[in-house]
Amino acid sequence: MKNRTFSMFYQEYEQLLEKEILSSEIPDHIAVIMDGNRRYAGQRGRTRSFGHAMGAEVTEQVIEWCYEIGVKELTLYAFSTENFQRSEEEVDGLFNLINEKFLKLYNDKRTYEKETQIRVIGDRTKLPAFLNKSIEKIEKATETHRKFNLNVAIAYGGRQDIMQAVRDIAACVSSGKLSLEDVDENLISKHLYPAPGVSVPNVDLIVRTGGDERVSNFLPWQANGSECATYFCAPFWPEFRKIDLLRSIRVYQARKDEKKQENSYRVSKVINFLGVGKYGEKSEELGQLLPLKKQGVA
């Protein structure tokens, strides 16, 4: 009886929370650091492969939740460059699991009904041939899809991503294809993973599970440039619930509201400084001058 009551309360709370976040702005791009699979397994006396398998099940659910809520782009940190330091058995097991999930997505009619474009970001030269084959297969099959974008980071490191982009640009400058005057933020973005000219957009919200409060070298260019919101939560990845996702979006929305209030406050200060009588009717135009901090107005 107690469990049933809790379940009913949980469902009602989830519905209320979803209704609340749907009444405000939904982040276009969410990036997730899926941490805690191994600790989840360890607490239960199970193998690490069990933890990764349970985490993979949650990943499938999160993809569905994001699509249903209206998120346009989801980037998942599946395997970092540092993960190669793990045992050969664990690395091989992870690659086999990732390959299995790619093939499942390839054969799932929902991938095509929902027009999901799937791309991999990372150093593919470090991946086994069978995995690269599956990646190429699903990328080719979904390359024209535009409704929902799913990026999977494998053999990925943020610094490494920026370094390879700089090398590509330097080679283009050296060969005469580009001049130094052509190099700007937009050009660098276009040379980041997954491929030249096909960039991952700025991130609105980073979610990390497992209790650690750090972003682990994940999408530094796309995240820091947009000053994205971050949400750190205690549950291990296999324990991640829809409520946790909804709460993370609520944090993003609260941050957006705080920025709007700050901007309104700054506009009012400028109006008062310039004279309400003369400029009061121009508050809307003044608001378009923000961020005022960059213009020297505190």
Curated annotation (Swiss-Prot):
SUPFAM superfamilies: Undecaprenyl diphosphate synthase. Its EC number is 2.5.1.89. It comes from the Archaea. It is an enzyme of class 2 (transferase). The active site is at D35, N83 (proton acceptor). It catalyses: geranylgeranyl diphosphate + 7 isopentenyl diphosphate = tri-trans,hepta-cis-undecaprenyl diphosphate + 7 diphosphate. One of its GO terms (molecular function) is magnesium ion binding. Binds 2 magnesium ions per subunit. One of its GO terms (biological process) is polyprenol biosynthetic process. Keywords: Magnesium, Metal-binding, Transferase. InterPro entries: UPP_synth-like, UPP_synth-like_CS, UPP_synth-like_sf. CDD domains: Cis_IPPS (cd00475). Pfam families: Prenyltransf. Substrate binds at residues 36-39, 48, 52, 80-82, 84, 86, 208, 214-216. Its cofactor is Mg(2+). Gene3D superfamilies: Decaprenyl diphosphate synthase-like (3.40.1180.10). Mg(2+) binds at D35. Belongs to the UPP synthase family. Catalyzes the sequential condensation of isopentenyl diphosphate (IPP) with geranylgeranyl diphosphate (GGPP) to yield (2Z,6Z,10Z,14Z,18Z,22Z,26Z,30E,34E,38E)-undecaprenyl diphosphate (tritrans,heptacis-UPP). It is probably the precursor of glycosyl carrier lipids. Homodimer. NCBIfam families: uppS. This is Tritrans,polycis-undecaprenyl-diphosphate synthase (geranylgeranyl-diphosphate specific). The gene is uppS.
